[in-house]
Structures are given as structure tokens and as C-alpha cells.
Amino acid sequence: MMAEKHGVLLVNLGTPSAATPAAVKAYLAEFLSDRRVVDLPSWQWQPLLRGLILPRRAPRVARLYQSIWTAQGSPLLYYSQRLCDGLQARLGEAIPVVLGMSYGEPSLDRALSALSDAGVTQLTVVPLYPQYSCSTSAAVFDGVAAWLARQRCIPALRFVRDYAQHPAYIAALCQRIRCSIAEHGQPDILLFSYHGIPQRYAAEGDDYPQRCLATTQAVVQALGLMPSQYAVSFQSRFGREPWLTPYTDETVVALATGGVRHLQVICPGFAADCLETLEEIAVQNREAFLAAGGHHFAYIPALNDDDMQITLLQQLVAATPA
């Protein structure tokens, strides 16, 4: 009887291959063509996307990527790969750990093929999204299922839906917050900013808002925060339909005009720092808060390649299915 071989697939959203308009256009075309992300009929959406949105949006977004690009390239890819390498070191060579991206490279197909070539018969898939959403976690499931559908022999599959309340995740977030307070002092308000989704997705059954609330409540309980000491908002809205509210960009301005002088912001939904945290929050929202009368703004970095996040992943992989 052939021995079972375990393997791990870590999945993040993805990133352009370069901070250029052409690379950003190619990445956004793939990302925004996923029906899990934008569910409009293709005949309606694709002409709008390719004829209007991408030509206008790609050059502007490329400039934003250029502002966060490092010598290592994309921060999201860099930290995701370091997470992968760190987990590989913890688990040992007998259990291959491979990184894949839903969009861009390294692709899911490439990552799954590498695990298959390594002889993996028991596969654990960990989307690096702490809070489940149909537009992120479910998109990973779709991508994995599409690859499996083309195989003659498929591995036993374990899919980690999310880890919004996992004790190791909550402990890591609390440690990040404590470090920020030690560096910057006690804020008037700690703002939890999550990536938004269209309100319609939640109305149709996506429990993402509840998962964000679960994370927030676990953290504030662990830190002993009162309701007057924190707030929750949703960022990165796209398009014209209503998204989850309150919106982060409006919230930081309202807090400043309402008398908040010291604001610290954490984005628990991002496992690795990326454009939405390093530019949208740490630059755009900081400027908006200060312009509206705020005095001190601090962005609390994502968990990135911190040992506590590697420990979290190790525990997620080791956990037995419910």
C-alpha cells in the first residue's frame, strides 16, 4: 500500500508582475473577470471592463504600485513567499508547502501541479483570508476545483474555510496592537478596517460581515477595550453599487472632525501588506485624517512573515477536520 504524502497549498490574492501599466492591466483583467469578484453578466461587464475601466485605471493604479514597490518587488508576494518558506521550515521537507495566487503568478495551476509532481495524496488548502468571503475564499475553492476537475487522480482535500476567531490569529493581532501602542502611545480610537464587499453579496448569504465582527469582538475582548475605544469600517470599494458601511475613508474624516486626535488603524483581513494597506490606508487615509484635524495617525502593519503568523498557519495545517 502506498504511503500517504501530505502537502500544503497557501493561497493569496495575487499581484501584478511589475509596477507598470501593462502588467497592472493584465493583472486587473484577470482579477476583475472572475465572476466571484464581479458577478455582472459577461456580455455587459467585459466591454465595459476592457473598453473603459482598464485603459483608464491601469496607468493610475500602476503609479500607486510604484509607490510601494520595493527592491524585492511586490510586498504582498514577498511576504507571502516568506510565510510559505517559514511554514516549510517548521513542517520539514517531508511535507511540501507551495504558494499559489488566485490571479497572476505563481498561479494556482502551477502550484497545484508542483504539489502533484511531489506525489502529494493528502492536500490542505489554506487561503490567506482570515474572514471568509465568496469573493476571496470561495474563489480559491473554485480555482482548486477547476484544476482538480482536469486530473485523473485527485488527492484527498482539506479546505480551511477561514480562521476569523482562531486563538493564534487573535493573539497575533493583539501583539501587533500592543507593539503599536508601545511605540505610538494610546490612541483615542483603534480603527479596524476590513476590505469591503458589495452589500448585495451579504444580502444574498455571504457571511463575511459576521466573520469580521467575530474577529473584532475577539480582539477587543482580549484587549479589554470599551466600545468608545474602537470603531469598525470597510475600505476599497469599487464601482457604483453600495458596499458594506461605514466606509473607511469617510470614517477617518468623521473621527477627526468629531475630535479624535490620535488614530491607529489595523487591517485584520490582510495577511500580508499590499497596495490596500501600504498606500490606501497608510498614505491616503492618513492624509485625509490629518487634513480633517487629526494630529497623529499610525497604521499597524499586517502580520506579514511574523513568527506568530507562521505558528498560526502551522496550527491550521495540523488541526484535524471538524
From Swiss-Prot:
Keywords: Cytoplasm, Heme biosynthesis, Iron, Lyase, Metal-binding, Porphyrin biosynthesis. It catalyses: heme b + 2 H(+) = protoporphyrin IX + Fe(2+). Belongs to the ferrochelatase family. It is found in: Cytoplasm. This is Ferrochelatase. GO terms for biological process: heme biosynthetic process. Pathway: Porphyrin-containing compound metabolism; protoheme biosynthesis; protoheme from protoporphyrin-IX: step 1/1. It comes from Edwardsiella ictaluri (strain 93-146). Disulfide bonds: none annotated. Fe cation binds at residues 195, 276. Its EC number is 4.98.1.1. Catalyzes the ferrous insertion into protoporphyrin IX. The keyword Aminoacyl-tRNA synthetase does not apply. InterPro entries: Ferrochelatase, Ferrochelatase_AS, Ferrochelatase_C, Ferrochelatase_N. GO terms for molecular function: ferrochelatase activity; metal ion binding. It is an enzyme of class 4 (lyase). The gene is hemH. The keyword Nucleotide-binding does not apply. Coiled coil: none annotated. PANTHER family: FERROCHELATASE, FERROCHELATASE, MITOCHONDRIAL. GO terms for cellular component: cytoplasm.
